């Protein structure tokens, strides 16, 4: 076929610099006059693939390169190349070119530009539509909200409270200190006439729940002045300068309502130590504004700032200097008398039975704050309502106390071996507490699981203890070791469980404090070693501390082994009673050890909430009259106890009988 050789020739000779065929072919086919340069290049490249050595029209590659380098030769040789071709061959040559390139455009650049401009226009339109919708949405939602967010008026919290000192119980010493503040607010002129300067600020320091906020409201109520409340966290915002702006608003409102009381709760959020980090150059604006405002108003204006915190150590020293917070008052958890007053206050708000022993409750709530006692009474009332009881009884309060300390009670496991281990473990704790002179008095012992514990042995302090002797601390160690030793003596060293893990943790902490903080080690001496300095100690000192701690723990284990080994019979008797009754008070424990309260010989692991008797019902016809007599006795005793209550033991006994036969 002649087309292929012609294509080979055109690759080297028939395409001029301008990318056009010469006049002869153009004259015959005027529609194919102009050949774009890019088409010519493609045509030439494609034609290289055709290699027909037998054709006489194929030109040597070296010669072709020479002709391509000479542009004049390329232009002048077309007629010579085509002059020997027949018209049909020339037509085939042109047709081959037409079919290869007519379907394409003259240049691909024009279509690429159109596509680019089309994409730009579409994206611009979409961006404009989304922007319009966003602007409309923000205009509708944030036009009224954002200015309010910026200009939040903290002074809008100003109010007159009706709380008085009679509503605050358990902190009489603090109230006496605050009476002076009330007098400052009531009659500031009396102090101004004599030349005395009123305090600008009073700082209330104490743990959470002791009543700092209630005391501040009581001061405002007693003085009959407006009460402006602000939380320290309300001054912290993302926007720079907003906290300082709110400080200015607060004191502007205070000056407009003077005389008044400004109360800033959790003041450590805004008044903490200033930072000098270059990463937070504006972090100190809020506290600096607070310091400036407290310097700015005069004591004659009748404005007193009360701050409350439980982290006084983190406050900036400039805030605590005289002239700002002049007075610091420490609010501690209530004492024994304070707890009695709080119990009387909150128990009056619920329906209570006749067997409430407030003094005993006060002994059992050592360390409780006012909020804790309020929660205790509320939980007891909830429990009574859930059981459809008409009154809050003493056992409701004790159950609420155990629930708050250890968590809700769980159903006892059915595994007898687990029950036996728990019984001998708790019996060991209780027996050591009874037989150790300096231990905290026993309150009750139970094998009902609560929280993560399989049982509980609780204690009641007869009085508030501010200081503890070495003998008392050693007694606490012995009581903690009683559980493990109780298991070991009965089941053997290889059969003990991990139930004493928490006891060992508490004992280790106590022994470390005795050595490192309390000075009860003769080898370490009277020195305090904080935990943060352990890495700074020498290796010999650390080893000595470890040896002293180990000595205290091992000596305690030895003492408890000796004690319980000599009381193995009493230990077993108490454990068997716990297996039957599940929960025993101190009086019941003493009765069991004295032989006055014996469990039945046939042990059955039952719940005290369902029975205190060896059998759940009559097994023979002879026991039916006995059950009827028991029912009559229960109702008679319950009727008498309503007017003249007996001891808690009798009340609990009759109550469980009533549950059995109801």
Curated annotation (Swiss-Prot):
Chain residues that bind Zn(2+): 425, 429, 503
Organism: Schistosoma mansoni (Blood fluke)
Keyword Protease applies: yes
Upper classification of the organism: Eukaryota, Metazoa, Spiralia, Lophotrochozoa, Platyhelminthes
Name of the protein: ATP-dependent zinc metalloprotease YME1 homolog
Cofactor requirement: Zn(2+)
Any single GO BP term: mitochondrion organization
Entry EC no(s): 3.4.24.-
Top enzyme class: hydrolase
Binding site for ATP: 206-213
Function: Putative ATP-dependent protease.
Entry's Gene Ontology cellular component terms: mitochondrial inner membrane
Coiled coil: none
């Amino acid at each position: 076929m002649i087309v292929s050789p012609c294509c080979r020739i055109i690759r080297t000779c028939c395409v001029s610099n301008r990318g056009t065929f010469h006049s002869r072919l153009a004259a015959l086919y005027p529609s194919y006059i102009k050949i774009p340069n890019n088409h010519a290049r493609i045509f030439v490249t494609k034609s290289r693939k055709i290699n027909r050595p037998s054709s006489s029209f194929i030109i040597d590659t070296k010669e072709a390169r020479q002709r391509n380098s000479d542009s004049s030769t390329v232009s002048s040789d077309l007629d010579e190349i085509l002059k020997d071709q027949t018209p049909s061959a020339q037509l085939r040559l042109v047709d081959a070119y037409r079919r290869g390139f007519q379907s394409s455009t003259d240049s691909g650049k024009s279509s690429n530009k159109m596509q680019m401009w089309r994409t730009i226009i579409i994206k611009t339109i979409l961006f404009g539509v989304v922007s319009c919708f966003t602007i409309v949405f923000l205009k509708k939602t944030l036009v009224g909200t954002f200015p309010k967010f910026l200009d939040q008026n903290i002074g809008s919290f100003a109010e007159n409270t009706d709380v008085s000192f009679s509503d605050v119980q358990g902190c009489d010493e603090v109230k006496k200190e605050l009476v002076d503040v009330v007098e400052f607010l009531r009659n500031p002129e009396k102090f101004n006439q004599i030349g005395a300067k009123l305090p600008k600020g009073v700082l209330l320091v104490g743990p959470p729940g002791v009543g700092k906020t209630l005391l501040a409201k009581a001061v405002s109520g007693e003085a009959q002045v407006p009460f402006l409340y602000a939380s320290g966290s309300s001054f912290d915002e993302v926007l720079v300068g907003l906290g300082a702006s709110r400080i200015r608003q607060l004191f502007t409102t205070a000056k407009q309502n003077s005389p008044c009381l400004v109360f800033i709760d959790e003041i450590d959020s805004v008044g903490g130590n200033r930072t000098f980090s270059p990463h937070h150059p504006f972090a100190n604006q809020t506290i600096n504004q607070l310091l400036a405002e407290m310097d700015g108003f005069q004591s004659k204006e009748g404005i007193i700032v009360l701050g409350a915190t439980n982290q006084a150590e983190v406050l900036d020293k400039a805030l605590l200097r005289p002239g700002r917070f002049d007075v610091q008052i420490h609010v501690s958890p209530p004492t024994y008398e304070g707890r009695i007053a709080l119990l009387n206050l909150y128990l009056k708000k619920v329906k209570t039975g006749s067997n409430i022993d407030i003094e005993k409750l006060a002994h059992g709530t050592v360390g409780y704050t006012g909020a804790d006692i309020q929660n205790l009474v509320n939980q007891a009332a909830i429990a009574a309502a859930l059981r459809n009881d008409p009154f809050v009884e003493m056992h409701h309060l004790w159950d609420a106390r155990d629930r708050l300390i250890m968590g809700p009670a769980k159903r006892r496991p059915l595994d007898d071996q687990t029950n036996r281990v728990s019984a001998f473990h708790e019996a060991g704790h209780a027996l050591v507490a009874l037989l150790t002179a300096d231990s905290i008095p026993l309150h009750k012992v139970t094998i009902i699981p609560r929280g993560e514990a399989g049982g509980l042995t609780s204690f009641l302090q007869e009085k508030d203890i501010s200081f503890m002797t070495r003998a008392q601390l050693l007694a606490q160690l012995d009581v903690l070791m009683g559980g493990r030793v109780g298991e070991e003596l009965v089941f053997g060293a290889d059969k003990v469980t991990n139930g004493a893990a928490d006891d060992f943790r508490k004992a280790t902490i106590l022994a470390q404090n005795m050595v490192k903080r309390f000075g009860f080690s003769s080898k370490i001496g009277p020195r305090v070693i904080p935990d943060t300095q352990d890495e700074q100690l020498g290796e010999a000192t650390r080893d000595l501390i470890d040896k002293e701690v180990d000595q205290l723990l091992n000596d305690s284990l030895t003492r408890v082994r000796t004690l319980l080994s000599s009381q193995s019979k009493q230990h077993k008797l108490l454990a068997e009673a716990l297996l039957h009754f599940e929960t025993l008070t101190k009086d019941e424990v003493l009765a069991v050890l004295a032989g006055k309260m014996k469990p039945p010989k046939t042990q059955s692991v039952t719940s005290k909430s369902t029975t205190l008797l060896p059998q759940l019902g009559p097994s023979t016809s002879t026991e039916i009259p006995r059950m009827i007599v028991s029912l009559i006795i229960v109702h008679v005793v319950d009727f008498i106890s309503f007017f003249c209550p007996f001891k808690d033991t009798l009340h609990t006994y009759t109550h469980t009988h009533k549950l059995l036969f109801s």
